[in-house]
Amino acid sequence: MWRAGRAALACEVCQSLVKHSSGVQRNVPLQKLHLVSRSIYRSHHPALKLQRPQLRTSFQQFSSLTNLSLHKLKLSPTKYGYQPRRNFWPARLAARLLKLRYIILGSAVGGGYTAKKTFDEWKDMIPDLSDYKWIVPDFIWEIDEYIDLEKIRKALPSSEDLANFAPDLDKIAESLSLLKDFFTAGTPGETAFRATDHGSESDKHYRKVSDKEKIDQLQEELLHTQLKYQRILERLEKENKELRKLVLQKDDKGIHHRKLKKSLIDMYSEVLDVLSDYDASYNTQDHLPRVVVVGDQSAGKTSVLEMIAQARIFPRGSGEMMTRSPVKVTLSEGPHHVALFKDSSREFDLTKEEDLAALRHEIELRMRKNVKEGCTVSPETISLNVKGPGLQRMVLVDLPGVINTVTSGMAPDTKETIFSISKAYMQNPNAIILCIQDGSVDAERSIVTDLVSQMDPHGRRTIFVLTKVDLAEKNVASPSRIQQIIEGKLFPMKALGYFAVVTGKGNSSESIEAIREYEEEFFQNSKLLKTSMLKAHQVTTRNLSLAVSDCFWKMVRESVEQQADSFKATRFNLETEWKNNYPRLRELDRNELFEKAKNEILDEVISLSQVTPKHWEEILQQSLWERVSTHVIENIYLPAAQTMNSGTFNTTVDIKLKQWTDKQLPNKAVEVAWETLQDEFSRFMTEPKGKEHDDIFDKLKEAVKEESIKRHKWNDFAEDSLRVIQHNALEDRSISDKQQWDAAIYFMEEALQGRLKDTENAIENMIGPDWKKRWIYWKNRTQEQCVHNETKNELEKMLKVNDEHPAYLASDEITTVRKNLESRGVEVDPSLIKDTWHQVYRRHFLKTALNHCNLCRRGFYYYQRHFIDSELECNDVVLFWRIQRMLAITANTLRQQLTNTEVRRLEKNVKEVLEDFAEDGEKKVKLLTGKRVQLAEDLKKVREIQEKLDAFIEALHQEK
């Protein structure tokens, strides 16, 4: 016990000593400090200089488990025991800090290099999208100039607001730990997850296949999108061309327009373009010269043409058909090597690879656009102009390659179509046939040589070209075979000249310069030239180009004047026919007639806005009543009128009117308004305009009317607004003056008399002719009509006895009528009695209602004063006044919608339809027909061709 007391006293002494010596109270225990921080803390803290490093000293020295003496608590000598430790702690601290710095620096350098390497790998995996920049409109790249990012940044929420919406990560971690515990406990779901993991490996092949299908689908969608925008671009270019033509034709006073002089070959190319359209329209063929390039598929036609044009301008494929439609290439000399299409103003710089790729892509798109669905090739021609220094002036037509077998994916008639296209061009007696033959294949496999020999058996306009001579020299065992081909002894055909060319090593990425150098180098070192098997003027594409150009212009000078004379005769015949048949009419072609019809149609649409409001409301009110009168009388008035008191009548009417207004009435009103607008529009479009009316526009006007009506849709909010207006109108029961009362009675009488007339006709058809018609017109009743007549007479007797008989017959009354008829020898069925009763009672009721209507003429005073007179209750008059007022208000509302909105929307639809028809040439040909239109079209085309031919001939003579 005394030891424990001494130990406690010693602890208190130590604690007080430490507090007095330190002067600062610590909040953090020393054990919780870092190792380095603890050493610094010991060295600098004045209290710790007086203590041992071990804080458990008190416990160790004064515990009951030890027998150590108290003399160890002497404090004075202990302060010198820490002197060596105080001398070395800065060195240890510096060593540790330096080690930490190297670790951090090394990690940063290694991590940065790894991150850069990973980023470069990811960057290489991303495909190059620069080829598709042209798809994105230009304004996308300039969009940052129109967006104020500062305003957007201010509109975005602050980081504090976003932090409030952030998920609670602690809760998510807790949920994930629970899920982990759940699955690690061996739940049944573990098996399912493992099965899924094993199944994922088996699905890899399916994923690869599906990814390939997605890529193919995206490529197909991209192609369709390109074709769509290609059509839009062509339409805009066509409009731009027409506007440019109008601007050039406009003769402004005081402004001198300089006439641009065209080259001779450009003028000739324009003549061929016009003739091509004329030939396609009238299924004829002109006889003007052009160079027709024919050959077997993959024989090198396109390569020869590219060597002549000195540019890789055509799309290429390894063994597959790439030329799907004829391509007319007009070569002319110019300072810059450029290409442009006939219907486009864009120039492709053929010295730039980007423009060359764009040109090839454009040609491929145009070919696909020309090919109709279900076909592989098309006879429609693509016209391309190529200008450049050193080019020989001529016009060449590249045709699809002749094939021997139709492969899968081709249309069944592909072979015949290619033959017919080739024959159509080669049948021209002035066409120069450039026959391309692959020298690397056996001559016996040639298809085109037989076709050429049929079209030009004497060889007066055929030039034979043997391609791939380098491969032929390597593969052919006997070089004399090539000599036989060039001399025209091997093939069963004749030609003006024979040429041998080399069009490269088969690499599509080769440039024209590289191919030309390879060709010259080959022929310089070739055994064929060294052994005089080939002559120098028969080799290289340059010599071929010069020879073809000379032959082309020789043909042009010999045949162009004869062609011009034939068109002069055609023009004279057409003009004479027009003067004899249409002496007082101008020669308007289809486009001019369409513009004239367009103006007439727009004038007729504007006439809709001239219709008076009174006329609109009258026809709307009348049409609406004709549409709803049956429902009002049969389903509202007649059921309510069967009641015996005023309260039940009004209740029934209000319920049925409310149901009718909520469901059917607004829709019926809109339908009536739309039909009324159609009728008025049709009336203005079809009514004759007197002697000036031209029936040639009737089909066009009818088509425009139908298409405009089909596109027009009434405003969606019209029914909702009408429902409120009609409901409020039907809720009003207060007739303010005698004039409105009389108008309601007149409206009611007119409606009931119409129904009574229909009922009388139904009864007459049921019972047959009366005695007057039987005597005058010699008509007799049938047996059934006689039975109906006897039944009617019996039922009328019943009504005379009881004028207030209800609407339905009781079973005993039916039995009584049947027995009375049987007593007179008339057998009748109960259903026949009911049918006859319906018409008889309906006539009786309508006559009673009309008599009551006459009584109510003088009942306005009682109604206005609210007198209760059971003998004169005019609730039915009030009902018809409510209906009449609803019709008037609805007609007024619909008239406002028509004049303010719908007429303008219809006019807009008509303009859109006319614009669509103006762009659709087939539609105009279908709608504007007749001998007069066709004759005007022929005259216009022939005049244009003759004018261009005369201008070309004049320029040709000047060049001589």
UniProtKB/Swiss-Prot annotation:
GTP binds at residues 298, 300-303, 317, 468, 470, 503. It comes from the Eukaryota. Residues 114-770, 782-960 are mitochondrial intermembrane. PROSITE patterns: G_DYNAMIN_2. The keyword Acetylation applies. Expressed in brain as well as retinal ganglion, starbust amacrine and horizontal cells of the retina. Absent from nerve fibers and photoreceptor cells of the retina. Residues 88-96 are mitochondrial matrix. InterPro entries: Dynamin, Dynamin_GTPase, Dynamin_N, G_DYNAMIN_dom, OPA1_C, P-loop_NTPase. Activated by guanine nucleotide exchange factor RCC1L. Residues 321-324 are annotated as: G2 motif. Residues 1-87 form a transit peptide. Residues 295-302 are annotated as: G1 motif. Residues 501-504 are annotated as: G5 motif. Residues 467-470 are annotated as: G4 motif. The chain crosses the membrane at residues 97-113. The modification N6-acetyllysine is found at residue 228. The keyword tRNA-binding does not apply. Residues 736-856 are annotated as: Paddle region. Keywords: Acetylation, Apoptosis, Coiled coil, Disulfide bond, GTP-binding, Hydrolase, Lipid-binding, Magnesium, Membrane, Metal-binding, Mitochondrion, Mitochondrion inner membrane, Nucleotide-binding, Transit peptide, Transmembrane, Transmembrane helix. Oligomeric complex consisting of membrane-bound and soluble forms of OPA1. Interacts with RCC1L; RCC1L acts as a guanine nucleotide exchange factor (GEF) for OPA1 by exchanging bound GDP for free GTP. Interacts with CHCHD3 and IMMT; these interactions occur preferentially with soluble OPA1 forms. Interacts with PRELID1. Belongs to the TRAFAC class dynamin-like GTPase superfamily. Dynamin/Fzo/YdjA family. This is Dynamin-like GTPase OPA1, mitochondrial. The gene is Opa1.
